């Protein structure tokens, strides 16, 4: 009898945890859309005066919605996860966000943020990404100058140039980096660990190794024509 009771108790607690996981995942998806609107609009409170019949001036607060100036950088949320910390008093929940930021003109970076709420975690991740931007070379306004491979831990990425009009042929995590960096025609293949965070970091490490013909010529002390020929 005791074993049966324990089984019932375990199954019910498991179902509760499963429901809570589904709930926060839905909330995370909703906040992705809300945070975009919050970034575009700003609510400003102003005080205005109105005259009453008895020559008495009353103040009231008026809310005005003002559009924020758009920045050249755009972001993509790669991953949102709920973090559980077991302490003496029980469990403490927080959220972590992993974001890629770029201006689609050769600058890209990734960032990580952690907070008690999803929007705060995303904002922290965006700030972290903006502080760790790198400049990457873009040839013919569409592709990389040459083939290159890179790795981060057990994740490996190979990037190749593609003809104009081919598009970005890559997985979701690699595609996010390529689009925000400004590439439009790319072949990319990922190997090893397929976790989104490690794949993004491996992609950025690969892009760091890219060099234009002019840069290679300067490093070798040669002319561009000598390298091309």
From Swiss-Prot:
This is Small ribosomal subunit protein uS5. Part of the 30S ribosomal subunit. Contacts proteins S4 and S8. The keyword rRNA-binding applies. One of its GO terms (cellular component) is small ribosomal subunit. Residues 1-27 are annotated as: Disordered. Belongs to the universal ribosomal protein uS5 family. The N-terminal domain interacts with the head of the 30S subunit; the C-terminal domain interacts with the body and contacts protein S4. The interaction surface between S4 and S5 is involved in control of translational fidelity. GO terms for biological process: translation. Residues 73-136 form the S5 DRBM domain. Pfam families: Ribosomal_S5 (PF00333), Ribosomal_S5_C (PF03719). InterPro entries: Ribosomal_Su5_D2-typ_SF, Ribosomal_uS5, Ribosomal_uS5_bac-type, Ribosomal_uS5_C, Ribosomal_uS5_N, Ribosomal_uS5_N_CS, Ribsml_uS5_D2-typ_fold_subgr. It comes from Mycoplasmopsis pulmonis (strain UAB CTIP).
């Amino acid at each position: 009898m005791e074993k049966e009771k324990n089984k019932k108790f375990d199954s019910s607690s498991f179902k509760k945890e499963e429901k809570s996981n589904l709930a926060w995942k839905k909330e995370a998806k909703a906040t992705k859309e809300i945070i975009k609107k919050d970034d575009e609009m700003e609510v400003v409170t102003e005080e205005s005066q109105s005259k009453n019949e008895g020559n008495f001036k009353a103040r009231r607060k008026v809310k005005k919605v003002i559009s924020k100036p758009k920045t050249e950088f755009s972001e993509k949320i790669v991953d949102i996860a709920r973090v559980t910390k077991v302490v003496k008093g029980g469990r403490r929940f927080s959220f972590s966000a992993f974001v890629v930021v770029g201006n689609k003109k050769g600058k890209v970076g990734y960032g990580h943020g952690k907070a008690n709420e999803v929007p705060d975690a995303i904002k922290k991740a965006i700030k972290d990404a903006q502080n760790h931007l790198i400049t990457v070379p873009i040839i013919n306004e569409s592709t990389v100058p040459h083939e290159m491979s890179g790795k981060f831990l057990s994740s490996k990425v190979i990037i190749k140039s593609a003809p104009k009009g081919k598009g970005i042929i890559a997985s979701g995590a690699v595609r996010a980096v390529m689009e925000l960096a400004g590439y439009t025609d790319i072949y990319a293949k990922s190997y090893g660990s397929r976790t989104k965070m490690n794949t993004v970091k491996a992609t950025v490490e690969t892009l760091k190794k890219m060099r234009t013909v002019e840069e290679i010529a300067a490093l070798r002390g040669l002319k561009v024509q000598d390298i091309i020929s």
